[in-house]
Curated annotation (Swiss-Prot):
Record key words, sorted: Disulfide bond, Protease inhibitor, Secreted, Serine protease inhibitor
Cystine crosslinks: 7-29, 11-25
Key word Secreted present: yes
Further comment found in the protein's record: Differs dramatically in structure from all previously described families of trypsin inhibitors. Consists of a helix-loop-helix motif with two alpha-helices tightly associated by two disulfide bonds.
GO cellular component: extracellular region
Location of this chain's protein in the cell: Secreted
Chain's role: Inhibits trypsin.
Name under which the protein is recorded: Trypsin inhibitor
């Protein structure tokens, strides 16, 4: 079980093609660990 910070690091590592995709990834991190 990854913590939110670890999840966010993964999002940034993916280098999404658009800021919107990155934001969606980060939002999912928050939701998963609510």
């Amino acid at each position: 079980n990854t913590d939110p910070e670890q999840c966010k690091v993964m999002c940034y590592a993916q280098r999404h093609s658009s800021p919107e995709l990155l934001r969606r990834c980060l939002d999912n991190c928050e939701k998963e660990h609510d």
